[in-house]
């Protein structure tokens, strides 16, 4: 009986979804300050240093009827890091840490999306940072989608993960932790 109920529910969902839009391509809206790549790292175990990467770009494919078919790609310029402290930023950008002259870009490309709830998913992909590529999983939340006041359509997500900097051949600067929390907020504009 349970199998028949599940099959009927799945068929009904499929029929309802058939009339809805297929997967659409979205460009991340960083120009309108609607997307952020923020980070934080523990300082001495007493507080956190917060920062952001100001120069990044990306896109994603999204179909609310089939979240598992979604994909995302984000490229960022490592020299665009900012923590509201010029000397610290210079040190983090140096060969002691990110070595932005040698590794000017970081990139994330998703390889799998697994729904974990009505509006949540695990987004796994390859992160290339400091010349090293490793699989990373982000905990993602779907914030919503719909029309915007300018005649377009948008969709928004938040995603978080914690990186072990040693995995990427990075030694923490000074008295900071070896783990870094990433918090990515994106709003995408549907491409026509």
Swiss-Prot record:
InterPro entries listed in its UniProt record: Lipid/polyisoprenoid-bd_YceI (IPR007372), TTHA0802/YceI-like_sf (IPR036761), UPF0312/YceI (IPR023480)
Name the record gives this protein: UPF0312 protein PputW619_0484
Record's keyword terms, sorted: Periplasm, Signal
A cellular component annotation (GO) from this entry: periplasmic space
Range of residues in the leader sequence: 1-23
Places the protein is found: Periplasm
Classification via PANTHER family: PROTEIN YCEI
Similarity-based family: Belongs to the UPF0312 family. Type 1 subfamily.
């Amino acid at each position: 009986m349970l199998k028949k109920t599940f099959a009927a529910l799945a068929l009904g969902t499929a029929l309802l979804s058939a009339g809805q839009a297929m997967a659409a391509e979205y460009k991340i809206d960083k120009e309108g300050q609607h997307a952020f790549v923020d980070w934080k790292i523990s300082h001495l175990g007493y507080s956190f240093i917060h920062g952001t990467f100001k120069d990044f770009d990306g896109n994603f494919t999204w179909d609310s009827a089939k979240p598992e078919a979604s994909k995302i790609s984000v490229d960022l310029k490592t020299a665009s890091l900012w923590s509201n402290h010029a000397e610290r930023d210079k040190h983090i950008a140096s060969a002691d840490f990110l070595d932005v002259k040698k590794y000017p870009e970081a990139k994330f490309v998703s390889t799998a999306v697994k729904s974990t709830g009505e509006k949540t998913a695990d987004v796994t992909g390859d992160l290339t940072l400091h010349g090293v590529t490793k699989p990373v999983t982000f905990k993602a939340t779907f914030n919503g989608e719909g029309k915007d006041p300018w005649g377009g359509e948008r969709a928004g997500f938040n995603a978080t993960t914690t990186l072990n900097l040693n995995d990427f051949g990075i030694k923490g600067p000074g008295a900071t932790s070896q783990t870094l929390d990433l918090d990515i907020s994106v709003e995408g504009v549907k491409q026509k």
